[in-house]
Amino acid sequence: MKPPPRLQSLIEEGLIDTVVRQLMSGKEAMVFVVRCGDETRCAKIYKEATHRSFRQAVDYTENRKVKNSRSARAMAKGSKFGRQEQEAAWQSAEVDALYRLAAAGVRVPTPYNFCDGVLLMELVTDAHGDAAPRLNDVAFTPEQALAHHATLVAEVVRMLCAGVVHGDLSEFNILLAHTPGADGEEGVDGPVIIDLPQAVDAAGNNHAQRMLLRDVANLRDFFGQFAPALLRTDYGPEIWSLYQAGLLGNDTPLTGRFARAHADVDMQAVLREIDDARAEDAARRLRMAMAAG
């Protein structure tokens, strides 16, 4: 196919040989399947802020570190240069998170290069070598749902131990990839976490707890459709409580149960949570409608 203008410079620089096809167009980026030598990869082109439906909400960008003091001042003032720097920081956040999580052992797409607002990374595939489906497009047996849920809860823990909260984790941004078996053994399917530009620093962001609880609840609600027993679990508060106490490790046993302490109710906080939940539900319904269309 004819390369989109944003990929032409990467072709000229020899980072991409050919563009095969468009894979998807989402709320924050367009993704293309490309050939790089003998390998097939994907190129993620980030949309400009004016063309994105996902806002750079202050909840996500709070306390993100900016190395250049001039850039930090410009971003604080909201100048044209500051907005450009803020956009660049938003895009590079996913690259930073991918490298950080890969180093921590979290299954994410392997990043290869980031140039001119384009991220070159691994094309995650299924057993036939085609682009892997999102969880939202797959039906599971109860046993599969329990297994994949356990894997993803462990990945959330691993991410948190690395200091990262995804912030928008759901069935829409997790792929079901196939890993070939060794020496003729049968391969296995497993989840791969994608879409990380909104990932937040667990220790530096005041909204990290709420985001982690929402991420874990999304996993419970999705897999609970196939394994209803999961709907009675409460992993999110348990994970965060252990993290706050300094007791959370990659191999920390979890029960899925959490006893909440009774305290005076902060009605303003409750109302804020209700408003947030309504907004998240509206966004979730929009994503489902877009996926169905």
Please place each PLM-identified region on the residue numbering.
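Activation of the activation-loop gatekeeper triad in protein kinase-fold domains
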Residues: 124, 194-200
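Regulatory N- and C-terminal appendages and interdomain linkers associated
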Residues: 1-25, 143, 147, 151, ...
